[in-house]
Amino acid sequence: MAELVRVAVDAMGGDNAPEEIVKGCIMAANDFGEIITLVGKKDIISEHLKKAGYNGDRIKIQNAEEVISGDDEPTTAIRQKKDSSLRVGLDMLHKGQGDVMVSAGNTGALITGATLIVKRIKGVRRVALAPLMPAETGCFLLVDGGANVCLLYTSPSPR
C-alpha cells in the first residue's frame, strides 16, 4: 500500500479563508484520504471543522497566530511574521513534517518563503509557478516560467 502524502495547507491565505479552505480540505480528505494539516488560527479552524460536521482523523491543525495578507511585502512578511500560517507551513515542509505545502495566499510571499526556507533543488536557478487548471477533459498543468528581458546592446532612443 502506498504511503499517504502529508499535505500542509495555509488555512488563512486566500479569498474567503479559512471557511472555503477548510471545506476544500474536508472534500480532499474524504475523496483522496491524504493526511492534511491545516495551518492557521486553531480556534477558528476548529470552529469551521465543527460547523461542517467533520469528525474524521485525516485533518490535523497546526496553530499559527499571524496571517500574511495580499498587501504585505513578501520578503518583509516572511522574515517578520514567523508565526504566520504561510511561514509555519513552509517551516513544516523544510523540517520534513510535510511532503507538500499548498497556499492560496500571497503568491510573492509563497515564492519568496519557499526560496528562502525550503530552498531550491541544486541546479535550479529560478522557480516557476505550475498550477493545475481545469479543462473539459480533466485538467492541465500551466507553467509560468516568467520572462527575462536581456538587453543585448544599447542604441540611441528613437525619440
PLM ranges: what are they?
Residues 139, 150-151:
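C-terminal extensions
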Residues 17, 151-152:
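Secondary-structure boundary/capping motif
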Residues 153-159:
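Conserved small/polar residues in nucleotide/adenosyl-binding loops
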